[in-house]
Every structure is written in C-alpha cells, then in structure tokens.
UniProtKB/Swiss-Prot annotation:
This is Putative NAD(P)H nitroreductase SSP0379. PANTHER family: NADPH NITROREDUCTASE (PTHR23026), OXYGEN-INSENSITIVE NAD(P)H NITROREDUCTASE (PTHR23026:SF125). InterPro entries: NfsB-like, Nitroreductase, Nitroreductase-like, Nitroreductase/BluB. GO terms for biological process: 2,4,6-trinitrotoluene catabolic process. Pfam families: Nitroreductase. Its cofactor is FMN. Coiled coil: none annotated. GO terms for molecular function: oxidoreductase activity, acting on other nitrogenous compounds as donors, with NAD or NADP as acceptor.
Length: 219
C-alpha cells in the first residue's frame, strides 16, 4: 500500500459521527476555509451547484435550531462550526438560476445554449426529475450530499471531526429560517446539517460490512 492510499484509509477510519465535541477547541480559519472549498469544488449533476452553505456560529440561532433539531442536541452546543446545507428549488433549464449558470458562470456561447437546454430538459424528463416541484427538489438535495461527503472527508484528512445530521423537523426548520430571513423559501429548502469540531471522547471501533458483502464484480 502506498503512503497516499494509507493516508486516505486512515482518514476514513478516523471519521465517525461525533455526537459531542470539545467546546473549547476551535477549528482554524484556514482549515475551515479548506473544508468549505471542498464543498464549493464538489461535483454536481450537470455542474449546476444547486446548493448554499450557511455557517451558523450565532448562539441564539443555534439555540433556536436546537429546539427543533432532535438529532443535533450535542452538536449545536459544542461544535466549533455548524453548517446548514440548502438545496436550490426549481432548477430547470429556463429558471433564472440555470440561465445565470450557463451564461455568466460557464459562459456558454449563445449558439450552443439551445442544444444545452434541450439536453438538460431531456435528461430531467428521462429521469422523471421535472415531474413536479418535489421531484426537482429531491434531485437538488441529492447533489448536496456529494458536497457533504467531500466536506467530511476533507475534515478527516485534517484530523477534524464531523457529524452529518438529518434529525430535524423539516417543516419547523424551514419556517424558522424563513421567518428569521435566513432563507428565501421560494428559492431554497433545508437539505442536511453538518457539524465540525474536535471529539470530546474517543469513539468505539468502526464497524462495517466486508467488501465481499457489498461489492459485486462483473468481468
């Protein structure tokens, strides 16, 4: 095994779902910016980046979230950094956001845009993504989990702990974020939370199925 291979596997063995962090230990600005950059640079379907990362350091906001996030009780109190990942709504070829991405970010030529839009529409139709608003949002939420995984892995490579969190009242969190002006519900919806910091106690040994249990080779 090469040194790089060992480093990668060590990071995955290090990572665990940390329920409580050492509240006295804080992640450096440089390290946390690296974690955010791995989220920003993550792949997404058609490269549309249908996400937003809200870093919640405000204690009052954390306390309000704690009341409606049953799976984040220890993390909201102790995490060095707490991130809410939002999924973008209405990601269709004619939406203002997609038009912005293809024209201003990706800078496609005007001549190529109609073909790009058709390819996008055909893809969403074939996968039943654009059947309704909920299927569109579900697709966008899938993309946020790619960024989530990359952020947690990069944290582990920096010896920083993390915990992904789905344990929250979706409707209540959405209402709170909307009422407090944190999100525009017309354009974004909560997808997943993730906490970062340094473990308070050592975890139990990692338990996973073997490769033989989960991998099938077709040769």
């Amino acid at each position: 095994m090469t040194q790089m291979q060992q480093t990668i596997l060590d990071a995955f063995n290090f990572r665990h779902a940390t329920k409580r962090f050492d509240a006295n230990k804080k992640i450096s600005e440089s390290d946390f910016n690296t974690i955010l950059e791995t989220g920003r640079l993550s792949p997404s379907s058609l490269g549309l980046e249908p996400w937003r990362f809200v870093v919640i350091q405000n204690r009052e906001i954390r306390d309000k979230l704690k009341a409606i996030s049953w799976g984040a009780q220890g993390q909201l109190d102790t995490a060095s950094h707490f991130v809410l990942i939002l999924a973008r709504k209405n990601v269709t070829s004619q939406s203002d956001y997609v038009q912005h991405m293809i024209r201003n970010v990706k800078k496609y030529s005007e001549a190529s845009i109609p073909a790009t839009e058709k390819k996008f529409d055909d893809f969403q139709t074939n996968f039943h993504i654009n059947d309704n608003d909920q299927s569109l949002l579900d697709w966008a939420r899938k993309q946020t989990y790619i960024a989530l995984g990359n952020m947690m892995t990069s944290a582990a490579l920096l010896n920083i702990d993390s915990c992904p969190i789905e344990g929250f009242d979706l409707d209540a969190v959405t209402q709170f974020l909307t009422d407090d002006g944190i999100i525009d519900e017309a354009h974004f919806a909560p997808s997943v939370m993730v906490a970062f910091g340094y473990r308070e106690t050592e975890p139990k040994d990692k338990v996973r199925q073997t490769q033989d249990d989960i991998v099938e080779w077709l040769e």
